[in-house]
Amino acid sequence: MAPTEPWSPSPGSAPWDYSGLDGLEELELCPAGDLPYGYVYIPALYLAAFAVGLLGNAFVVWLLAGRRGPRRLVDTFVLHLAAADLGFVLTLPLWAAAAALGGRWPFGDGLCKLSSFALAGTRCAGALLLAGMSVDRYLAVVKLLEARPLRTPRCALASCCGVWAVALLAGLPSLVYRGLQPLPGGQDSQCGEEPSHAFQGLSLLLLLLTFVLPLVVTLFCYCRISRRLRRPPHVGRARRNSLRIIFAIESTFVGSWLPFSALRAVFHLARLGALPLPCPLLLALRWGLTIATCLAFVNSCANPLIYLLLDRSFRARALDGACGRTGRLARRISSASSLSRDDSSVFRCRAQAANTASASW
């Protein structure tokens, strides 16, 4: 690559082409060195996340969508969360190919816009759905009696539909401002952003609404839940375990997306001219965004692994589904350390439901 080449090897990054932005023209002279061997390990990481995320999230969707009988509230959120992660990972092979080609996008302008739209929308949906799960846990633990009219399957489904509507709106700027941008030499193109003040400001606003705000809501809910758990009457062991699983999901999401979101905010401020940065810091920001993008993308395959590691009932059901067994194994496994006996159950199979006293949501 040329040393001053615009940069957009990943969908979470924007090209380092500052032409047309007042006060930032001097940054065009900054060198644009790539991470050593990034064209090797970044595609490999993306493809690994694609394989694990596709299998894991497709299994969760199959498990919950094919379940007969009434569905508990958290099942609705988990089903939509798995669908969002599934939509996210389906775009990863495209970005893996682009990364392997040094940022060159061989799939045309339409797929550039569509895949960018899918990433933005599913990322927003995931953040809002996790915030919805936190609010549901808050209502179940802290406001159990007062929240009964709100904690119904219809309200949960309406909340998820509202999340998807917001996610579609959040993805629209990608359809407008992202597309093929020329690489130096004019023969190849990359999938990147137009150098527009409007898009940078809009991206900052969306970052606030689709990451910072859900994060604040989540932290508030878990702080209140933590206070409630320390007061008598104490919450039962099953509910504590279900909270532990959901907290692990939330923590993984925040740990994966917080570095990316923070660096993206700095990047947008730099492009707006509000935060002038010297060339060494710009290069560090570029490398940091590349690494943070990889970390964020890996999150799309994390939730099924969390269910597998922390939920014994899910492990039994997964084994039954993989081996074609009848469910006798699931009946023999205690659900004391899973979500299944609490109202936050996600993966109780029908055999367990017939033999275990069900707890209300």
UniProtKB/Swiss-Prot annotation:
Q: How does it sit in the membrane?
A: Multi-pass membrane protein
Main location per UniProt? membrane
Q: What is this protein called?
A: Probable G-protein coupled receptor 25
Against PROSITE patterns, the record matches this protein to: G_PROTEIN_RECEP_F1_1, G_PROTEIN_RECEP_F1_2
Role description = Orphan receptor.
Keywords, A to Z?
Answer: Cell membrane, G-protein coupled receptor, Membrane, Receptor, Transducer, Transmembrane, Transmembrane helix
Any single Gene Ontology cellular-component annotation: plasma membrane
Residue spans making up a coiled coil are: none
Tell me its family. Belongs to the G-protein coupled receptor 1 family.
Query: Taxonomic lineage per UniProt?
Result: Eukaryota, Metazoa, Chordata, Craniata, Vertebrata
Set out the biological process GO terms recorded for this chain's protein.
G protein-coupled receptor signaling pathway
Cytoplasmic compartment: which residues?
A: 61-75, 148-155, 221-242, 311-361
What gene, per UniProt, encodes this protein? GPR25
Residues exposed to the Extracellular side: 1-39, 97-126, 177-200, 264-289
Q: Where in the cell is it found?
A: Cell membrane
Entry annotated with the keyword Phosphoprotein: no
| One Pfam family, short name | 7tm_1
| Residues annotated as transmembrane | 40-60, 76-96, 127-147, 156-176, 201-220, 243-263, 290-310
Source organism superkingdom: Eukaryota
